């Protein structure tokens, strides 16, 4: 395992890439409503990212099981946990939830963040799933400080979500991030206190709880990208890119614009 500690200059570049991801998610939030296709959202995202002089990292991202990813964002609706492919056939409906995962490459460094949006009015049980998943993200981030261990992050996410009876997906993880979108180490959403590698200042991590309302078992659709819950219950996904610091992690990405647009914090 090769982990790259970032310099302050590199962190500054990563901050710019991640701020662009946050701005892109906020721009997409303006378009999320019943009747909109996920293909439209993808076109909005790609234009917005390229207009800022950046590259949408996910476009043509390689797939060990099939064709490269064909779009600029992942649009995962309801029971799709991650990697949903934008399509003109996927039309948002009132009561849906959609997780939009976005990555940018700017000045040689990557940004990565995901937000699960409500489409119109959603049920109270789905609202709680979103709330708890987002809470677990920040509880995990609280553990991402120098001197703690990688397992402390996963333990915080897992214990919070499981007390509500939710499933914590095991096969998918967060990751290190920097010049490459996916670097070491993998950041699991489960674990035990004090386990795993020691966290050091300058590590940049994408922490991303992927939480299911029902069973944690998942499956791969024939498109070789979309991963769904086997029981077809909804899933939520929130992600921030952070840098490990002494005392308190620094969050490089941002939900501020998205939450301002929503008018409330989930």
Give a label for each model feature:
Residues 1-266:
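Active-site neighborhoods and metal-handling regions in enzymes and metal-associated proteins
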């Amino acid at each position: 395992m090769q982990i790259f500690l970032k310099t302050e200059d590199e962190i500054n570049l990563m901050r710019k890439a991640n701020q662009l991801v946050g701005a892109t998610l906020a721009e997409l939030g303006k378009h999320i409503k019943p009747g909109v296709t996920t293909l439209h959202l993808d076109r909005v995202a790609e234009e917005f990212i390229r207009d800022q002089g950046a590259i949408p990292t996910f476009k043509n991202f390689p797939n060990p099981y099939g064709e490269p990813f064909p779009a600029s964002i992942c649009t995962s609706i309801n029971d799709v946990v991650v990697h949903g492919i934008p399509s003109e056939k996927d039309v948002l409906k009132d009561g849906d939830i959609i997780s939009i995962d976005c990555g940018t490459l700017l000045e040689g460094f990557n940004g990565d963040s995901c937000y699960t949006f409500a489409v119109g009015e959603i049920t109270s049980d789905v609202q709680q799933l979103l709330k708890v998943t987002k809470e677990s993200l920040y509880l995990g981030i609280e553990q991402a400080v120098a001197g703690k261990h990688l397992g402390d992050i996963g333990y915080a996410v897992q214990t919070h979500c499981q007390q509500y009876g939710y499933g914590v997906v095991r096969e998918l993880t967060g990751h290190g991030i920097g010049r490459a979108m996916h670097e070491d180490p993998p950041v699991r959403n489960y674990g035990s206190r004090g386990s795993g590698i020691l966290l050091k200042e300058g590590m940049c991590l994408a922490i991303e709880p992927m939480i299911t309302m029902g069973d944690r078992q998942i499956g791969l659709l024939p498109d070789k990208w979309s991963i769904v819950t086997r029981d077809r219950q909804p899933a939520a996904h929130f992600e921030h890119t952070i840098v490990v610091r002494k005392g308190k992690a620094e969050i490089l990405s941002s939900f501020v614009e998205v939450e301002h647009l929503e008018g409330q914090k989930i």
